[in-house]
Amino acid sequence: AQGLDVMEVMYDMLIQGDGKELFYQPLGGYQSYSLDAQKKLLEHPNVLFGLSDGGAHCGVIADAGMPTFIMTHWGRDRTRGDKLSLEFIVKSLTSSTAEAFGMYDRGYLKEGKIADINIIDFDAMRLHRPEAIFDLPAGGRRLVQKPEGYELTIKAGEIIFDNGVHTGALPGKLVRRSNEKREVALNS
């Protein structure tokens, strides 16, 4: 409508946010403008929730917000298609993942288990827009996406985050998988 080339419009949009604007383009899985195929994948018994490339692409991918996105979009906000139950989401983010990595001593709120606990305000949960920060060695860039709605994060009985602010407590330690052996059968 402005008589501008698409690239000109994109560049104009990028400079509006003091150089901090980003464009997002899904690389796949959204060709039909529906997330129904992703829901089917997420529900498959051999699929684990999680994303990581060990930080190799932290300047172009902000995937640390994945748990918050799963809870807010799939568990609360989705309007075009069925949601996932919150119980399924929590199990998938906790015990299912722990067991897949042989960590049978965690992932449950049970006596004798190691429990890291997030106290959340589910209705207040949301993700901020991704932003680039330059705090890596030699001024390297990484993308971060801050969440809201996490009231407390407790590790080993100590509060490590209070309303999104780190308390300075560092009770964590190196995690190794359990020596416990279990038979694993893939579901088809």
Q: What are the functions of these language-model segments?
A:
Residues 85-88, 126-133, 137, 182, ...:
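Short, positively charged
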Residues 79-83, 147-156, 183-186:
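Short C-terminal domain-edge/linker segments immediately following a structured domain
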Residues 40-47, 52, 119-171:
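C-terminal cap of metal-dependent C-N hydrolases
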Residues 25:
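Aromatic- and Gly/Pro-rich donor/ligand-binding loops
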Residues 67-71, 136-141, 172-174, 180-182:
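Short, low-complexity, polar/charged sequence segments that are solvent-exposed and flexible
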Residues 161-188:
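Intein/HINT protein-splicing elements and their conserved insertion hotspots or analogous self-processing inserts
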Residues 30:
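Residue-level marker of regulatory loop/turn positions in helix-turn-helix DNA-binding domains and
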Residues 1-16, 22, 33-126:
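His/Asp/Glu-enriched, well-ordered alpha-helical/loop segment
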